[in-house]
Amino acid sequence: MRKNILTKIIGFLAIVAILAGCKAKKELLPASAIPKVMELMPPSPDLTQKIKLDSVNGMNTVFKTLSIKAKADLNINNNSNDVNMNIRIRNNEAIWVSVTAMAGLEIARALITADSVKVLNRMDNIYLKKPFNYIYEFTNERITFQTLQSVLLGNAMSEFISESTQLKNEGQNTQLKTVLASMVYNFTVNQQNKVLFTQLNDAAAGQELLVNYTNFLSINQQLIPHSVIMNSKAKNKAISLDLNYLKIDMDGNVDLPFRVPERFLIKN
């Protein structure tokens, strides 16, 4: 069981920008399976482009709350750990994560809002409380709370889509690309305009996030990926997180319990 496991998971989601147990190695997504990012010619912002971009944004999952039960394989520099995760989201408000070992013992808990990142490390009895900009130690400063939600759900990142977004048809799929100063946002959508692949790349900072989405199932008449595989590189660390969503409940009441025991050491 590794110490500080949730701090590493939060760092990983931060690289996104956040998201130990019995060890079980899993095969990571081979490089050949990751769609290649193609050089795109800048198209004219015509009606066809606008219709496509509106359609992509229109297929984003719309919800008030989500409750997700997941199995996860976290691999940091080839050290693999299997854990269970409960993820609860209040749209544009809070992301709550509970991490348990396979024996059912909770080892960590986190509460992320647009203003703060809070972590209970039950392995070491430590409470970490940081402002949201703590994640910028790991990722580009353009990353927002909404970006984190999009990564977990496979939504297109609407905050990075504009008339400057370039489009290119690739078979039945469409590749889209937006350049934002040093950060490049690439993603691929299928015929239903659901995101299959996301890449956030900041070459100047040496940071990259790749996410693949598969196994789309209908929840409340909306297609949501149930397999999410993330691979990131930042600060000389290679991290992967393989999430398998076992159950998703939408728009129910969700509690976000977060009580700090008196015995915990507080780190700000």
Positions of PLM-derived features:
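An acidic-aromatic
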Residues: A94-F145
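Gly/Pro-enriched, hydrophobic low-complexity segments
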Residues: A24-L28, T165-N268
